[in-house]
């Protein structure tokens, strides 16, 4: 039987304890023991994440641990064991043990029980167990449930701790006891502790009280209220949600025991903190320092007492005595108000005195008291600011007079050769001083006196000898001209007006020493040299007679150097100059005095100028065009002489322009078989130029033009040469492509085929005859013309498939027909097709007509027999029957024969049979057509190749007498298909 112990886990409340909290596992349903087969949902809740997130679950059972992960914080389980969870970045939770019991009776209890909770214990039984309504605590009967399954603890407290179980009876067997559940009631929060910002505050200072506690993690959402007390008196307004209480000022009367209470809402659980003593501290007052004897003349050796006293009594006070801020002595006294020290006066005891009193709450100083010890002055000492015997004119000298001993104030007097100079009074130690600038008259003996009321004391005399330093020298040139040429001789003169001998002169050029000379008296020295270009610059001289050199004003010397022959450099952004590039002409004379004016030339024509004020080089920029090819030079001039550079040649390459592609053919319209010339030419561009020719972006070939200009490429045209053409020009800089040019190669029309189409077997006056003309080859648009006996009937245009012309037949329409096809490249004429329109004679009446009709019927019968025989023979020969099922209905209509004239297609061999029934004057000729296909037959439109009508054609009507109107017959030299 499993004993389950509920663990207490605390969470921080009000920020008192900072630590990383563990997540908590919550159960649904809330029981730790359930029957096997039931499910329990575990929820992992953390206190630093507020939305479900990826969670790890650890399940340990019988020594084995299984790790699972869920995308959220929920896991549904059915297995017994110990479960823990871990959210991202959190520690592992405390373990929760679940028991999926196979017992017939179980007692269910919640995972955690806290003081003040309403607790339900549920006794559940399987079907074969009957409850006896008894629940036990620590094996003692606790209650009879009277058939109820739940036992309620309305307000849990520590007395409810114990082991609980319930009992029942198995049917026809024995008593059954449930598992034992151990209940341990936990406090929802820890006992509070009172904290104070200070337990020994100084009187008048504020204090903050804090009631610290921790809520259990399972009860972290339970609100707490707080109440603060001093002794048994409530502070403030009573219960508050804040764990802090502010006392704005603490006084001595506020000392006492302080404590606090924390309670859950609605005050079901209340806990008191321990009591803490707060002692208000009173700091010492400012002490008073007194001297004794008072107002006495304090000579050296007199005994003086200093007394320091406060106004309040303290358990212990530390007194300290100070002289000019330096500690002298200290005394610690108990329950006394003051302390004293005594000493005999010396000269060092003069000054300010004060004391401090400290009772542990900070030292408080007294006001300062001054003590003056009277001492006669000693002989003063006179000092100069410089120990040197030689003092130069203009220097600043300080005389310092000081008596080493003597009471203040002291009156000091300075003297020069017995004459009083100046007097000064000193109220502090250190003496006095006077300063002045020396002249030659200040040479002589000096002394000083000191007097503090007991008679003046005189110092020893000090001698002062004033030396005159040299004045600023003046540097001059031998020539007043500012411009001096290379090779000339120049003399520098350096001279001073005043100064004690001996004087050292030094000459400098740009701070570099040139020459020096020493003279025993005031005057000047000179220095000469021949000029070179390097002598340009600033010159000065110095004069020194032992008191530091004096420097003259700077004199500038400019040595003018003629310019040398300049060097011209051409700079372009690439190895070869190209139109559009920025050309920099760089001209530089290696030697020559500035400023230098540079001129730039192209083919001796001035481009421009540029000045170099400081010497060196100059540049001139050009944006290149084709005209900039040629010779360049530059010139340098600094006013003395002009120098011309060598000539440099520049060749400017011109990128090819976009080429133009043109077609050159023998006629306006390109025709199959023509020789086409493709001419490509770039109007601009440096040679050589390589031309590429393209048809539908496929390279046809390339041709080079070494001297520029255009290039041509020839083609013998076929129908495949229709399409888009372009060309490309490239002279090594950048290839340029022409615009696309479309070429359409025209095909001349072939010889057309003329076909006559009538609605019946015999053409009769009034029938609608269709003349169809078609050229099997030829570029559209094709114009078809129709002719009857070479007389134009009409014309039709057609892009494809031929054209037709309809005629309503009359007797005059018999004769020869032809057609012509023309697409602008030459007309082609079809072969002639003959059309006969005939009829019976006028005396076709009575018996004769009947005889003729009978004869015609006989002939028709013979013709039908011949047709059947011909079809049978055709089948035996493997030819397609006339009634081919693949034909369309229009193709099988025997009433719409079609007549063609197809040149070189089939050779027809007619067999003629005359039919002249009863000797009448109308003779019919029967034509049997024998078709012999030639190997070189020309293909035609499939619709013209179908078999239409009977293979027997009445090709000619011979009239023996005057024709009469009647049925019409058609004859054609074209084969019947």
From Swiss-Prot:
Domain Ig-like C2-type: 23-101, 188-271, 287-374, 380-463, 473-556, 566-651, 659-744, 752-834
Impact after mutating residue 687 to C: In a breast cancer sample; somatic mutation
Residues of this chain annotated as glycosylated in UniProt: 383
Protein name: Fc receptor-like protein 5
Compositionally biased residues, Low complexity: 883-892
Domain comment, as recorded: Contains 2 copies of a cytoplasmic motif that is referred to as the immunoreceptor tyrosine-based inhibitor motif (ITIM).
Topological domain spans for side Extracellular: 16-851
Cytoplasmic topology ranges: 873-977
Taxonomic superkingdom: Eukaryota
Complex formation: Interacts with CR2. Interacts with CD19.
GO biological processes: B cell activation; cell surface receptor signaling pathway; immune response; single fertilization
Keyword Transmembrane helix (UniProt): yes
Record motif ITIM motif 2, residues: 910-915
SMART domains referenced in this protein's UniProt entry, alphabetically: IG (SM00409), IGc2 (SM00408)
Location within or outside the cell: Cell membrane
Cited function: Plays an important role in B-cell response to antigen that acts both as a negative or positive coreceptor. Inhibits B-cell receptor (BCR) signaling in the absence of CR2 stimulation but engagement with CR2 and the BCR lead to a superior calcium response compared to CR2 and BCR costimulation. May be involved in B-cell development and differentiation in peripheral lymphoid organs and may be useful markers of B-cell stages. May have an immunoregulatory role in marginal zone B-cells. May play a role in fertilization.
Alphabetized SUPFAM superfamilies for the sequence: Immunoglobulin
Organism: Homo sapiens
Taxon lineage: Eukaryota, Metazoa, Chordata, Craniata, Vertebrata
Alphabetized UniProt keyword annotations: Cell membrane, Disulfide bond, Fertilization, Glycoprotein, Immunoglobulin domain, Membrane, Receptor, Repeat, Signal, Transmembrane, Transmembrane helix
Motif ITIM motif 1 boundaries: 897-902
Transmembrane segments: 852-872
């Amino acid at each position: 039987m499993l004993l389950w112990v509920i663990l207490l886990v605390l969470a921080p409340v009000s920020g008192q304890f900072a630590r990383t909290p563990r997540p908590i596992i919550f159960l649904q349903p809330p029981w730790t023991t359930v029957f096997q087969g039931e499910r329990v949902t575990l929820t992992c809740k953390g206190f630093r994440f507020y939305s479900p997130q990826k969670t790890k679950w650890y399940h340990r059972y019988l020594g084995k641990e299984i790790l699972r992960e869920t995308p959220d914080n929920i896991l549904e389980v059915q297995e017994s064991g110990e479960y823990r969870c871990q959210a991202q970045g959190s520690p592992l939770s405390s373990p929760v043990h679940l028991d999926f019991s196979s017992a017939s009776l179980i007692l269910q209890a919640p995972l955690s029980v806290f003081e003040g909770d309403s607790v339900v214990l549920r006794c559940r039984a399987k079907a074969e167990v009957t409850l006896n309504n008894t629940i036990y605590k620590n094996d003692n009967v606790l209650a009879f449930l009277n058939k109820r399954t739940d036992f309620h603890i309305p307000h849990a407290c520590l007395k409810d701790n114990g082991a609980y179980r319930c009992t029942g009876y198995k049917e026809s067997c024995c008593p059954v006891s449930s598992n034992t559940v151990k209940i341990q009631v936990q406090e929802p929060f820890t006992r509070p502790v009172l904290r104070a910002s200070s337990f020994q505050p100084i009187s008048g200072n504020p204090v903050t009280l804090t009631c610290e506690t921790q809520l259990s993690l399972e009860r972290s959402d339970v609100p707490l209220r707080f109440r603060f007390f001093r002794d048994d008196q409530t502070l403030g307004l009573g219960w508050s949600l804040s764990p802090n209480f502010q006392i704005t000022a603490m006084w001595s009367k506020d000392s006492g025991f302080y404590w606090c209470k924390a309670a859950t809402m609605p005050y079901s659980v209340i806990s008191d903190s321990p009591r803490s003593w707060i002692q208000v501290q009173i700091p010492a007052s400012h002490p008073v320092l007194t001297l004794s004897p008072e107002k006495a003349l304090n000579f050296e050796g007199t005994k003086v007492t200093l007394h320091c006293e406060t106004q309040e009594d303290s358990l212990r006070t530390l007194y300290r005595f100070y002289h000019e801020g330096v500690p002298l002595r200290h005394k610690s006294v108990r329950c006394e108000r003051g302390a004293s020290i005594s000493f005999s006066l010396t000269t060092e005891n003069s000054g300010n005195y004060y004391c401090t009193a400290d009772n542990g709450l900070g030292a408080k100083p007294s006001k300062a008291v001054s003590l003056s010890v009277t001492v006669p002055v000693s002989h003063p000492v006179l000092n100069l600011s410089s120990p040197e015997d030689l003092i130069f004119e203009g220097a600043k000298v300080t005389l310092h007079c000081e008596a080493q001993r003597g009471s203040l104030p002291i009156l000091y007097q300075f003297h020069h050769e017995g004459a009083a100079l100046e007097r000064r009074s000193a109220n502090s130690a250190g003496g006095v001083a006077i300063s002045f600038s020396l002249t030659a008259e200040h040479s002589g003996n000096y002394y000083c006196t000191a007097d503090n009321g007991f008679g003046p004391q005189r110092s020893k005399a000090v001698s002062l000898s004033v030396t005159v330093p040299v004045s600023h020298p003046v540097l001059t040139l031998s020539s007043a001209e500012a411009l001096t040429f290379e090779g000339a001789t120049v003399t520098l003169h350096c001279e001073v007006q005043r100064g004690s001998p001996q004087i050292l002169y030094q000459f400098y050029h740009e701070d570099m020493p040139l020459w020096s000379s020493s003279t025993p008296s005031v005057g000047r020295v000179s220095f000469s040299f021949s000029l070179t270009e390097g002598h340009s610059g600033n010159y000065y001289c110095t004069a020194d007679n032992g008191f530091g050199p004096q420097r003259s004003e700077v004199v500038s010397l400019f040595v003018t150097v003629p310019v040398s022959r300049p060097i011209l450099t051409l700079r372009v952004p690439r190895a070869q100059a190209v139109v559009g590039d920025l050309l920099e002409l760089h001209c530089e004379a290696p030697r020559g005095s500035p400023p230098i004016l540079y001129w730039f030339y192209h083919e001796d024509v001035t481009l421009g100028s540029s000045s170099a004020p400081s010497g060196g080089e100059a540049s001139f920029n050009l944006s290149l065009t084709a005209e900039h090819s040629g010779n360049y030079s530059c010139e340098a001039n600094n006013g003395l002489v002009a120098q011309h550079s060598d000539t440099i040649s520049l060749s400017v390459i011109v990128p090819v322009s976009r080429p133009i592609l043109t077609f050159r053919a023998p006629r306006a319209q390109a025709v199959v078989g023509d020789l086409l010339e493709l001419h490509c030419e770039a109007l601009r561009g440096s040679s050589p130029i390589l031309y590429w020719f393209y048809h539908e972006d496929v390279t046809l070939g390339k041709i080079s033009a070494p001297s520029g200009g255009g290039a041509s490429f020839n083609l013998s045209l076929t129908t495949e040469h229709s399409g888009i053409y372009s060309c490309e020009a490239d002279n090594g800089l950048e290839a340029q492509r022409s615009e696309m040019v479309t070429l359409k190669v025209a095909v001349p029309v072939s010889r057309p085929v003329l076909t006559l189409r009538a609605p019946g077997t015999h053409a009769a006056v009034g029938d609608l005859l269709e003349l169809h003309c078609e050229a099997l080859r030829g570029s559209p648009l094709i114009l078809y013309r129709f002719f009857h006996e070479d007389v134009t009937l009409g014309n039709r245009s057609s892009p494809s498939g031929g054209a037709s012309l309809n005629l309503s037949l009359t007797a005059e329409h018999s004769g020869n027909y032809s057609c012509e096809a023309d697409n602008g490249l030459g007309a082609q004429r079809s072969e002639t097709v003959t059309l006969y329109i005939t009829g019976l004679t006028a005396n076709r009446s009575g018996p004769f007509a009947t005889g003729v009709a009978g004869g015609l019927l006989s002939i028709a019968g013979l013709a039908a027999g011949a047709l059947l025989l011909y079809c049978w023979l055709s089948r035996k020969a493997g030819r397609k029957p006339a009634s081919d099922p693949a034909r369309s209905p229009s193709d099988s209509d025997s009433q719409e024969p079609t007549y063609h004239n197809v040149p070189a297609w089939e050779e027809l061999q007619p067999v003629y049979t005359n039919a002249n029934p009863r000797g009448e004057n109308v003779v019919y000729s029967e034509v049997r057509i024998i078709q012999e296909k030639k190997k070189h037959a020309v293909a035609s439109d499939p619709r013209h190749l179908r078999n239409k009508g009977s293979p027997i054609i009445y090709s000619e009507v011979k009239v023996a007498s005057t024709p009469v109107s009647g049925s019409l017959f058609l004859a054609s030299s074209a084969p019947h298909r």
